[in-house]
Each structure stands twice: as structure tokens, then as C-alpha cells.
Amino acid sequence: MSTEVNLDKLYENSIKILSDLIGFKTISGEDNNDLINYCEKYLNDLGATSFKTYDDEKKRVNLFATIKAKKSNGVKPIILSGHTDTVPVSKSWSTDPFKATIKEDKLYGRGSCDMKGFIACTLAFAPVFSKVDLNRDIHFSFTFDEETACLGAPILIKELKKRNIQDGIC
């Protein structure tokens, strides 16, 4: 199978996904289920397996999804890790912070740089991972409440240990 990547299409997909992610109001301490469900469906449609972990109230959720290696050779997986929450919106916004806005070749929106932009890029590249003969698993690890006290990551780490999921390269 060819590993050639159409960078223009990858860029366009990244912008489309990022625009979608910005539309989810995932301020620290608030519900992020809709964003996680979006990411999970996107990855599962590509053949990934996934599971979620929750806070005690089940209003904030982590996602761990895996695109399995086709030819595993025992090498450590790659973990693409990011957080889904954003800081609260300040009053100085001149546009809707939850609608991606492009001005002078720059995209603006809450979380576009920290860290929904990275998550969008990982999701945009996921179709490539799903089609090539990977020699290692690719994990997608998306957590909640990094902006405040990193509350989501410890919950996910506990579950990873229970499932004996191998650490990897982040």
C-alpha cells in the first residue's frame, strides 16, 4: 500500500476537524462528553478500538483509542496525547470564541493552540495510520481538566495500568 500523503487534503481535514472541536465548549471543570464522543466516533469509524474513563459525576471523560499495528514487532507504541479542556473565555474576544474564524491566514477560536489544534492534527492523520502497515500501535489519549489540576490524567493512568497497556513514546 502506498504511504503517499496528500498534504493539501490533510491540511483541509485538520482545519475542518479543528473548527468542529472549537465548537465544543469544553471549559475546565465542565462537561466534555460531546467532544469526546465526536473523537471516539471518528476514530472508531477508522477501525480503532477505544474506551473511556470518567470523573465521579460522569460529566468529564477521558478517551483512549488505539489503531492496532498490522505487523506488530514488539516495539513500543506511539501515544498521541492531548487535553480537551480550555481556560475560561475572557471579555477581550472580538469574535465568537467557539466558532473558528480565519483572519489573515490565522485561525482563531478557543483552544485552537492549546490544545485542540494538536488533537485535530492527530485525528486528521488517523486515516493514514489506519491504511498503512504499522509496525507499532498508535494510541490516542485525550484527557480532561489539564488547565486546572490535571484531574483527568490520573484516572486514565489508573485504568491503563489495570488493562496492562504498555507505555510508549509520547
Residue ranges and their predicted role:
Residues 115-170:
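Acidic/histidine-rich catalytic neighborhood of metal-dependent amide-processing enzymes
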Residues 2-110, 129-135:
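Acidic/His- and Gly-rich active-site-bordering loop/insert found
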